[in-house]
Amino acid sequence: MTTLKVDQVSKLYRSSARGGGLTPALRKVSFEMKPGEVISLIGESGSGKTTIGKVLLRLAKPTSGTVTFDGKDIASYSGRGLKDYYRHVQGVFQDPFSSYNPIYRADRVYDLVRSSYFPKVGDREWSEKVEAAIDAVALNPADVLGKYPHQLSGGQQQRLLIARALLLDVKVLVADEIISMLDASTRVDVLNLLVKLKGQGLAILFITHDLSLGNYVSDRTIILRHGAIVEMGATGKIFGNPQHDYTKMLLTAVPELHKKWQHAPLAPVAVSANGAGEGLGAGTAELLTSSAPGSRLAQASILEELTHAEQVVKRDLRAVFGGGRAVASGKSQVAVALEPPALHEFEPDHLVAEPE
């Protein structure tokens, strides 16, 4: 059964520039969400990801197209109907800190849910419901109840907000960049929580710019560019056999940090710079960052396998071989293969992005 359906949704914003023209944020976006699945909505900044989340949460009105929930157009909801809609469709956002008033205890967000949706529930029953919801997000109620926001970690705050959604009998969770402000270990906890909730029948829209996170958590993936869907399908298929050039470009930029660099047999050295083939002997091979405009190494995955850094090097790259001789610069396309004797492992601090 389809829980939520987006059908040919477009959204135009009026530009603030002189002339006040219309700027498209979404272009005929269509997809369906069903119970018990995670859909990753992936794209660069400005691709329209957050706009889709706002449309689903009735925070933005589509210029054209419809969004239906259990067969009913959400634009038709008002009053009690809209209140019921928000009971079943909830959002959790990038910055958990902004959802709390620092002068009140963090669990006050549950009091607001109670007064709006469960005013007749007694104190004891409500406390049991709150503790059950907090347990469901892998937190100990004794560790978080009664605490102020500044006394909780970002991960605890985010999970408390997910627990608030669970109190409402939520069916669809819009998770907009919810782990981008969390540290690495906490990210895994929240991702695993989403997988657990999916198993309990929750439909989750996981909005992210990070393909590796989407690959980890989702059943289906939507790739968005300039407000339009360029590719959509099973996550394994999208990541394993991408069809659109934009998807391929995004995937080549993903660092595979789980892969350890080893002295495994590789093909013989073959370097082509500006169309000229050139063989390199068994010398030192390095990958360095470069601030030179246009310098780029086509096979950036080599850097990803050589470094254990958690951050992607933001500068363009160039290949430098024996004696510091650059074989790639400008707009040249380079294919690189290295023999094991030519490989040397460097500590992460040898591969550091230049200061911005």
Residue ranges of model-derived segments:
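A short, surface-exposed alpha-helical micro-motif characterized by mixed small hydrophobic
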Residues: 214-216
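The feature captures the beta-strand-to-loop junction immediately N-terminal to the Walker
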Residues: 42-44
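Conserved ABC ATPase signature
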Residues: 148-152, 156
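ABC ATPase NBD coupling module
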Residues: 18-20, 74-90, 108, 116, ...
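Conserved ABC transporter NBD signature motif
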Residues: 65-73
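ABC ATPase "signature
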Residues: 232-233
